[in-house]
A protein has these predicted regions:
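Glycine-rich adenosine-cofactor-binding loop
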Residues: 1-15
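Phosphate-bearing ligand-interacting subdomains
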Residues: 35-94
Length: 179
């Protein structure tokens, strides 16, 4: 897990509750430039190394808990060193017929993605979010909790859609927007 802050600790719990845990992947630990990030916390796997300079092993897959503008940069560093990102879908998420979810995308607990929606690569879609039918989500987006994207919504690339936003039918959210 990249990042051992609050979202990283949340990602640890989510990873243990997601499809494939224990059969397709296990949690080895965190990488974080703040190697003391877990000093005041118990019951988490260790921070095994800083992010800077970390060399991914062939059998490792990653999820990234870092938000904001540094998320993409951090992930691209790991990808550039040969790292691969896990597509992680929480066991309680509901995916409709013909839904496509790209590599490295995280789908949180109790999230619903409607029929024929397409979700690109490296997105973070947090818990209790609704992505309506026929919606298209590009790459590198962060969609926070309790967001509703009604049917036919298009979210281009690199956007941040914050908690409880509601976006109506057939609206396009342009690249690098903040909602």
């Amino acid at each position: 897990i990249i990042g051992a802050g609050g979202m990283g600790r949340t990602m640890y719990d989510m990873a243990r509750e997601s499809i494939g845990y224990g059969t397709q992947y296990d949690i080895h630990g965190f990488i974080d430039d703040n190697v003391a990030a877990l000093d005041n916390f118990a019951n988490y796997p260790p921070i095994i190394a800083p992010i800077q300079g970390y060399q991914p092993q062939e059998d490792e897959v990653f999820v990234c808990s870092i938000g904001g503008t540094s998320r993409q940069k951090c992930m691209e560093e790991i990808i550039g060193r040969g790292g691969k990102f896990l597509t992680m879908i929480h066991a309680t998420a509901r995916l409709g017929t013909n839904v496509q979810v790209g590599e490295g995308t995280i789908v949180g607990a109790f999230t619903s993605i409607g029929a024929d929606a397409k979700v690109g690569k490296y997105n973070l879609i947090q818990s209790y979010t609704v992505v309506g039918h026929d919606s298209v989500i590009g790459n590198w987006n962060r969609i926070d909790t309790h967001v509703t994207l009604v049917g036919g919504t298009i979210v281009q690339d690199g956007t941040d859609i914050h908690t409880s936003a509601m976006i109506s039918h057939n609206v396009t959210v342009e690249s690098h927007s903040r909602v």
